[in-house]
């Protein structure tokens, strides 16, 4: 059965404007309540994740566990749909519980009023399933609704990116605006998905029905442009697709230019015949999915961490230096990694680390670069490079010249040879021995960065033996 769509055909940004009205029950408790804070989903530090916060409305003190279960369902319903499901690891989710005196929400036409903390109500602005909190057409006082939300968010999770108010009412309904409001009805989960498109990616409604006095600029998924080369989603349009595109089943799966969007039946266009931003329950189209993925990367970067954490380095010895990073991998595909030294790609280096050998570099300044990219098929147009991140290190190599002097070997009374090595090599020497000057065996490694090194060869069965000091490879 098709889900109701009437609620969603109300421009979200209009909800910021309310006017004075009467509501039978208004909660006038202090807006300074701290609430109970808990974690639903954690994938990383809040500074490096997109943070969802869910708040309880119409749940009594005895229903805290019920709210947590309902809030978890809201999170799962959102993050289990494309494109969010690919980037679930990029999200955290938290809950703030403040008890209400009564369960549910107001239904004014039924003379049903509840004493709840955020004073939510159905039937806002004459729309039966439009659920809002003040300021609205029934109560213009910001402090009775949105002000309480803002105070809790500021106190408990100022790093939030998306706030969702979960209303303990089984009737279908919700709204968008500064926050998303949704009832606990399973059908209402689609409202959260739709409204997240507005909040995160600034997507527009694709409805054709007129809404009085609605205006505004183009959104990522709406346009008045009809010239193929200037359409913002032209990368998704096949050359054979006619523009404007007929609203016919033959083009149901095509990205094109379909007339009717932005609350206008004519002269405004959308990318696809149908989409979540037009019909509840339909998946996001390619253009909207692309905008959502890019919006995720506006909040979360693809490199979780890197080392060395200092990006200006000085090397004065020949020890191997390891560079590494931790890519934030999506759930269903890997990020690609490239390493470059002095602008040249290192062949075969596609993993999370790179070993740098100072001996392979001349003294002076060198650059090491790691480039991480999400090559998802969901994005074709990324002019700002949101899906990639580059980490640069500047390496100053300053190795002192190596020199060595071997004293003639001294045969000891027990038949062994003693070797004295004097010299300097920041990475040390390999001391090698041979009986034929063709085959050399390493006797000691990483010896003598500077000064004198004394070595006694344990072998006693050689009548003669040659020794040499070489730099390690």
Regions found by a protein language model. Give the residues of each.
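Boundary at the C-terminal end of the N-terminal hydrophobic targeting segment
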Residues: 28-33
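Exposed beta-strand face motif in extracellular beta-rich ectodomains
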Residues: 364-369, 463-467
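Solvent-exposed segments in extracellular or luminal domains encompassing
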Residues: 352-365, 454-458
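Active-site recognition of the HExxH zinc-binding catalytic motif
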Residues: 189-206
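Propeptide-to-catalytic entry region of secreted or membrane-anchored zinc metalloproteases
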Residues: 34-152, 183
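Short, composition-biased motifs enriched in small/polar/acidic residues
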Residues: 398-473
């Amino acid at each position: 059965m098709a889900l109701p769509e009437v609620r969603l055909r109300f421009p979200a940004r209009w909800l910021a404007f309310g006017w004075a009205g009467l509501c039978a029950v208004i909660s006038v408790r202090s807006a300074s309540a701290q609430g109970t804070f808990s974690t639903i989903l954690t994938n990383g530090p809040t500074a490096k994740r997109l943070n969802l916060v869910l708040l309880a409305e119409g749940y009594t003190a005895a229903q805290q566990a019920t709210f947590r279960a309902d809030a978890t369902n809201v999170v799962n319903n959102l993050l289990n749909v494309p494109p969010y499901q690919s980037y679930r690891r990029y999200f955290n989710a938290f809950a703030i519980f403040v008890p209400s005196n009564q369960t549910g929400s107001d239904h004014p036409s039924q003379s049903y009023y509840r004493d709840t903390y955020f004073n939510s109500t159905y039937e806002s602005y004459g729309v039966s399933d439009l659920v809002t909190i003040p300021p609205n057409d029934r109560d213009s006082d910001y402090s009775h609704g949105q002000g309480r939300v803002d105070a809790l968010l500021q106190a408990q999770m100022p790093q939030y990116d998306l706030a969702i108010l979960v209303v303990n009412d089984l009737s279908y309904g919700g709204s968008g605006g500064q926050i998303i409001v949704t009832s606990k009805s399973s059908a209402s989960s689609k409202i959260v998905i739709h409204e997240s498109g507005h909040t995160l990616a600034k997507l527009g409604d694709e409805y054709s029905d007129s809404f009085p006095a609605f205006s505004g600029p183009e959104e990522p998924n709406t346009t008045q442009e009809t010239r193929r080369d200037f359409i913002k989603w032209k990368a998704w349009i096949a050359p054979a697709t006619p523009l404007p595109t007929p609203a016919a089943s033959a083009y149901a799966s095509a990205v094109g230019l379909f007339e009717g969007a932005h609350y206008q039946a004519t002269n405004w266009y959308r990318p696809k015949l149908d989409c979540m931003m037009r019909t509840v329950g339909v998946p996001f189209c390619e253009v909207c999915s692309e905008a959502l993925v890019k919006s995720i990367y506006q909040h979360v970067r693809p490199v979780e961490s890197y080392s060395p954490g200092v990006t200006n380095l000085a090397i004065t010895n020949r020890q191997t230096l390891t560079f590494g990073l931790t890519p934030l991998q999506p759930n269903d595909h890997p990020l690609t990694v490239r390493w470059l030294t002095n602008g040249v790609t290192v062949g075969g280096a596609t993993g999370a680390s790179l070993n740098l050998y100072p001996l392979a570099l001349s003294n002076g300044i060198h650059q090491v670069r790691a480039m991480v990219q999400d090559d998802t098929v969901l994005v074709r147009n990324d002019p700002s490079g949101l899906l990639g991140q580059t980490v640069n290190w500047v390496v100053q190599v300053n190795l002192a010249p190596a020199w060595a002097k071997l004293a003639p070997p001294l045969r000891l009374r027990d038949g062994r040879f003693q070797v004295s090595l004097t010299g300097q090599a920041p990475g040390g020497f390999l001391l090698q021995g041979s009986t034929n000057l063709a085959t050399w065996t390493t006797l000691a490694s990483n010896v003598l960065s500077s000064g004198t090194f004394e070595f006694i060869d344990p072998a006693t069965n050689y009548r003669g033996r040659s020794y040499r000091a070489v730099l390690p490879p």
